Structure formats: structure tokens, C-alpha cells
């Protein structure tokens, strides 16, 4: 019996829960920022970060449910570190696309594609508006 897989699943599950909590709190804080003094770039970058946190948490939780380490702790940390240097929304999608090479579950991959297409449509339809949160998920997502 291989003991590595349960350990990775436990790590993924715990990290998923922690990242999910951080993402939710961060999103709520960003939702309160509705003043014109905040530049659109800051709002967009902040929303990208909160969506990324939520996405990583979802993948971790799915990984634990399927008892397969779909996303390992190190891959999440490395992607989150690379996210700090984002210049624009396009780079965000490029970094998130790297996740497709890590994922092995077709359901997760299809959800990932639908999620990114919906975010891309929102970004294209409402580019840079002052004091407005661009990505506002429905309460059912959380």
C-alpha cells in the first residue's frame, strides 16, 4: 500500500481549505473597495488574485475527493509565486493554462475551460471601470 498518495491528498485538502478561506476573505475585502481613487489596474489585479485563490482551492478540494493528487502543494505554490509578477489579464490566462498540464480529471479540465471563458467575456465586455469590481461571482459559487 502506497502511503504517499494519502499524504498528498491530506496536504491538498488542508491547503485547499486554507486557500479557500483566504480567497473568500480577500474577495470580500476587495468588494468593499468602490472608491474612484483606487485605479482600475489595482482592482483588476486584486480580483485576479482572489479568483486564482478560489480556483486553486476548488482544485485542491476536488483532488482530495477523487483521492488523486491532481494538484500538488509545490505546483500551487510555484504558480502563486509566478502570479505576483503579472502585468495584465492575458498573462493571468497564460499562467492558469499551465494548470491543464497538471490536471488529469476531464471534469476538472472542462470546468476550468468554462470558468476561464466566462471570466474572459466579463473582462472583454467591461474593461477598466473605476470603482467597480469586475469579477463578481454569484453567492452559490462560495
UniProtKB/Swiss-Prot annotation:
Origin: domain of life: Eukaryota
Stated name of the protein: Putative uncharacterized membrane protein YBR064W
Compartments in which it is found: Membrane
Keyword set includes Nucleotide-binding: no
GO cellular component: membrane
Organism field: Saccharomyces cerevisiae (strain ATCC 204508 / S288c)
Main location: membrane
Topological domains, Cytoplasmic: 1-9, 63-101
TM ranges: 10-30, 42-62, 102-122
Topology Extracellular: residue spans: 31-41, 123-142
Additional record remark: Partially overlaps YBR063C.
Topology versus the membrane: Multi-pass membrane protein
Keyword terms: Membrane, Transmembrane, Transmembrane helix
